[in-house]
Curated annotation (Swiss-Prot):
It comes from Chilobrachys guangxiensis. Disulfide bonds join 49-63, 56-69, 60-105, 62-80. Expressed by the venom gland. Residues 1-19 form the signal peptide. The presence of a 'disulfide through disulfide knot' structurally defines this protein as a knottin. This is U32-theraphotoxin-Cg1a. GO terms for molecular function: ion channel regulator activity; toxin activity. One of its GO terms (cellular component) is extracellular region. It is found in: Secreted. Residues 20-43 form a propeptide. Belongs to the neurotoxin 03 (Tx2) family. 02 subfamily. The keyword Mitochondrion does not apply. Keywords: Disulfide bond, Ion channel impairing toxin, Knottin, Secreted, Signal, Toxin.
Length: 110
């Protein structure tokens, strides 16, 4: 019985370490969104659209892609930061809705 526990424990530790190393190879979700938004501007024609990374005072919304206006020490003020649930299913639903809204938005190359 003792050997079974040790084998099971070793497998669990190995699996956790392997999954952590695997995730480091891929860019962070926020980095992917940021790089995508660097290439395209989803700002409205009147320039009222506020995106992630922009300085803000209140809300951050652009064609349904909503983020939160939060204080940032590194940026020297408040900037729009992404927001999400720790439960990935909720994130997938929220991002799907945002993508549908964003698809209706006019976009132009930045």
């Amino acid at each position: 019985m003792k050997h079974c526990f040790l084998i099971l424990f070793t497998l669990i530790v190995f699996t956790v370490v392997w999954s952590l190393e695997e995730n480091e190879e891929y860019p962070d979700e926020d980095e992917m969104i940021e790089s995508f938004m660097d290439g395209y501007s989803y700002r409205g024609d009147d320039g009222t659209c506020i995106l992630k990374g922009d300085h803000c005072h209140g809300t951050c919304d652009c064609c349904g892609w909503t983020t939160t206006c939060r204080k940032s020490k590194s940026a020297g003020g408040k900037i729009c930061k992404s927001e999400g649930s720790s439960i990935s299913a909720f994130n997938a639903i929220a991002k799907g809705v945002a993508a549908m809204k964003k698809a209706k938005c006019k976009h132009k190359s930045g």
